[in-house]
Amino acid sequence: MGKVQILAVLTIDGCLSSELYGKAHKDLRLDRCGLDEIRKNALYRVTPDYSISMLHEWREDGTNTCYLAEATPDTADYIYGLLRMQAVDEIILYTIPFIAGTGRHFFKSALYEKHWTLASLKSYPNGVCRSIYALDR
């Protein structure tokens, strides 16, 4: 079965991180936190150009293909749609030690109740934490 992953870099207050935060973002050296490895492990990078129904079909195709959708302020509505349509198997959250104060929150209201299992947790010397959650089936 294929797997749809969401990758999100969030501030402590739950806002999608963006390179707009400039120096604070660069000082964290996120390139040393395994982001590139996650991106390389995905066979397909999912963008808003892919329909959610197409992803549902791919998930059921019997392969172990990994589809990665990266949450950014620009793709937030699409990612929210994936979550609402229950098309996500795994959520990879990077939490950075920074409070944005304002911004685009990753999780919004009106999502279906779903139970997730913490599959992996890793902290990095720069204060970044990576949590990987797998959907309970």
Question: What is the predicted function of each stretch?
Answer:
Residues 1-137:
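Enzymes that bind and transform nitrogen-containing heteroaromatic metabolites
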